């Protein structure tokens, strides 16, 4: 998307490919390092190929320049989302070619303007959606995906804002038409979207929020939802014990057998929305068995049954809405409403933790283990913390040590920086 010098781009591609194959690149320095022009290079997290954490590298890469209609942003912080794990595994429809720079959202300072860009100036503080390439020191993205941020919003908050709050708002108000007195069930209530859903529900009178989350998160998030259940419990019976008719809205990021459970909980005229499929991610790499099992467990929906029971089933993908279906204008209106709520102190992004670019492996492992409460942020200017001796221990979701997998020995080391 952004224009780069052909020679520099080719050199960077060779660096990535040779490093992934453990071969020294031609023309490197005598110490084995790889250099681009210091004045026009940047650091970027690069996914060399689909698979485990060992596919991630930190490279010096040619800096992009804005094309017509684009802004160049000096990145301060980037958001890390569950979709980034699925991209790393290649566990998405029509995955892009590797090598690539992951990431879909960031915040920072406008550094340059492409031709025909209006409404922005160099030095503006902004947050943005990016169609990949966000995990870098500099990004270029079309102006329609860029939004100015309030003066009192930190860059880490701004990086935690777009994906989570826009997703939550569109599902609640554009798709499900949330109104006073309704009830909502949200899975992964302790995650970034889950916390955004809880906060937005609090802006509507008398909304009851049912949430599922890992038990260790309950103390931290108990005040944000009305009723909280363990993610492994029989939440269907728990919800019906409290509300015999069920709920008006189900927000499902899990998929699998939760689809049927969610539909069974809907009241007449209720809406079930699928916006993720995290149950398909079990191991560090893509698993055909996990994918097949999760897909097999999805209840086959009969339209006649929906008609008879007066139920609505929907899906939502923010990235597809933005980058494939051309609804940037709709999303800009949503962002403006959300910033208004932020300025009124009614919503505030929940940031779980900040990670250096060098620590992206550890950050991804934390979100894979469902250990986060709120959003994980890559802080571009953060210095990586020293590795602890026991940081390399890998555990399952049940807290038990997992067996070593092929390539795991490399995953237990800090991601190397390839100059």
Curated annotation (Swiss-Prot):
One of its GO terms (molecular function) is zinc ion binding. The keyword Oxidoreductase applies. Belongs to the zinc-containing alcohol dehydrogenase family. Quinone oxidoreductase subfamily. Residues 1-36, 384-419 are annotated as: Disordered. The modification Phosphothreonine is found at residues 393, 395. Detected in skin fibroblasts. This is Synaptic vesicle membrane protein VAT-1 homolog-like. The modification Phosphoserine is found at residues 392, 396. Its EC number is 1.-.-.-. SUPFAM superfamilies: GroES-like, NAD(P)-binding Rossmann-fold domains. Keywords: Oxidoreductase, Phosphoprotein. It is an enzyme of class 1 (oxidoreductase). Pfam families: ADH_N (PF08240), ADH_zinc_N_2 (PF13602). InterPro entries: ADH-like_N, GroES-like_sf, NAD(P)-bd_dom_sf, PKS_ER, Quin_OxRdtase/zeta-crystal_CS, SV-ATPase_mito-regulator. The keyword Phosphoprotein applies. Residues 397-407 have a biased composition (Acidic residues). Residues 1-25, 408-419 have a biased composition (Basic and acidic residues). PANTHER family: SYNAPTIC VESICLE MEMBRANE PROTEIN VAT-1 HOMOLOG-LIKE (PTHR44054:SF2).
């Amino acid at each position: 998307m952004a224009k780069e010098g052909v020679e520099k781009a080719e050199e960077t591609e060779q660096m990535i490919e040779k490093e992934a194959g453990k071969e020294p690149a031609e023309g490197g320095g005598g110490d084995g390092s790889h250099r681009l022009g210091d004045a026009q290079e940047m650091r970027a997290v690069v996914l060399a190929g689909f698979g485990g954490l060992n596919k991630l590298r930190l490279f010096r890469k040619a800096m992009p320049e804005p094309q017509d209609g684009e802004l160049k942003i000096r990145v301060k912080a980037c958001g890390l989302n569950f979709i980034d794990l699925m991209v790393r595994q290649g566990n998405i429809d029509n995955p892009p070619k590797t090598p690539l720079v992951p990431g879909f959202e960031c915040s920072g300072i406008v550094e340059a303007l492409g031709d025909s860009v209006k409404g922005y100036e160099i030095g503006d503080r902004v947050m943005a959606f990016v169609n990949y390439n966000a995990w870098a020191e500099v990004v270029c993205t079309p102006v329609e995906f860029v939004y100015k941020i309030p003066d009192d919003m930190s860059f880490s908050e701004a990086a935690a804002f777009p994906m989570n709050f826009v997703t939550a708002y569109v599902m609640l108000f554009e798709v499900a038409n949330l109104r006073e007195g309704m009830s909502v069930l949200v899975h992964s209530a302790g995650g970034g979207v889950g916390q955004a859903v809880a906060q937005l529900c609090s802006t509507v009178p008398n909304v009851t929020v049912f949430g599922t989350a890992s038990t260790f998160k309950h103390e931290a998030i108990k005040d944000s939802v009305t009723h909280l259940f363990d993610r492994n419990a029989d939440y269907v019976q728990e919800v019906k014990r409290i509300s015999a008719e069920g709920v008006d809205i189900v927000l499902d990021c899990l998929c699998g057998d939760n689809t049927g459970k969610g539909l069974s909980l809907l009241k007449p005229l209720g809406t079930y929305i699928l916006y993720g499929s995290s149950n398909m991610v079990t191991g560090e790499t893509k698993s055909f068995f996990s994918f097949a099992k999760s897909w097999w467990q999805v209840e086959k929906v009969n339209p006649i049954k929906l008609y008879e029971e007066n139920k609505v089933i929907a899906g939502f993908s923010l990235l597809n809405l933005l980058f494939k279906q051309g609804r940037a204008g709709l999303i800009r209106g949503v962002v403006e409403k959300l910033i208004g709520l932020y300025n009124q102190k009614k919503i505030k992004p929940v940031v779980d933790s900040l990670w250096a670019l060098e620590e992206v492996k550890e950050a991804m492992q934390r979100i894979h283990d469902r250990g986060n409460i709120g959003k994980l942020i890559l802080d571009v200017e953060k210095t990586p913390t020293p590795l602890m001796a026991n940081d390399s221990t890998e555990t399952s979701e049940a807290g038990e040590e997992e067996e070593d997998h092929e390539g795991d020995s490399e995953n237990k080391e800090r991601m190397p920086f390839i100059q």
